Amino acid sequence: MVECYNFSCQGESHKADSKPCQDASFSAVYEDGLAIAIVCDGHGGERYFRSDVGAKMAVEVIFDTVKTFTSSIDKSLFIGQPYTAVEAIASEEILKKQTPVDKAFRQLFSSIIYQWNNRIAIHAAHTPMSEWEQEHVPQKYLDELNSSETFEKLYGCTLMVYVQTPDYWFAFHLGDGKCISFQQQPFWHEPIPWDERCFLNKTTSLCDSNAINEFRYCYEGDGSFPMAVFLGSDGMDDSFGEDANLVNFYIQVVKMLVTEGRDSTIQSIESDLPQLSKIGSKDDMSIAFIYSMCELQAHIADFIQYQIDIVTDSIRQTDERLKQLESKIAGITSVSDEKTRIDFDYAQKDIERANENRIKLLYKYDVLMQQLSKVFTNN
């Protein structure tokens, strides 16, 4: 049984500036087996003062176009296809080599762009400037609202989508944020190719003039499906820093789903993400995911074992670090001069910190081993 969930919350910095949440998310599972997860992130910055509207409209457009796409496309186009990942188009030569699947996706993306532009044009034409906009937005950006050439920038946003049917799945992405997929081999990866243009505060966008060539996507129709796919806006990955930390958070979500149930997991996510924004990125947070509870239950030991392997490797690295520090101290025969004394003191403090970290890692290891033992006992 495939299930889904999504949640968006206002970022801590947005609360301070009285700015709305500029993220939007959606997820749904239908009786025919279609499952959809969407995350759209409206751009920050003074120029993009209606990006919250742009993100919401992007979600609506994507939902409509994907439903139409999956109901009208010949599924034989996907059936039997191995996992395939396609990067953003960098040249006209790539366009000439497109497969029938590539052409179908290009039509889907073109429809999304066209319908989104139509909706924001209607909104811009019929929605006067609010008091907040007049008070907080520089006049040069307010003037763009009346410009037929640049008004779409005011609504700019990114998008990330995962779609699963009984016969195939696909995902596509425009902009930043992270899509993480869990399956048996490799255990986790980012199925959608990354775009190096998305770096720091720079990102590709639905409002770009060349957006049609900036979509990246992937698909598979050979009978293999992920156990779970998580979509997270950049407020999520910016808070966790390294991908490994973000992956560990998603594993914790998976473990909680299996051991404590859906309701407790949702309650935890909706209380934790605002706090994570407060101590982390300060940005809006969005998460959406599709998962098979049966698959997660069957493979929960793999999730725990992955964490055990990570902790074991961290213990090994800490032990190597301790040996290096102890060797350094052993080589100091005299602390008569100031530089040697300072080096000696730093090495001792580093050893203390490494030992404290090792104790914490050993505790984590013990807890994880107990969790793994419990899984095998229950089975």
Located regions from the model:
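Catalytic core of PPM/PP2C metal-dependent serine/threonine phosphatase domains
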Residues: 78-180, 215-223
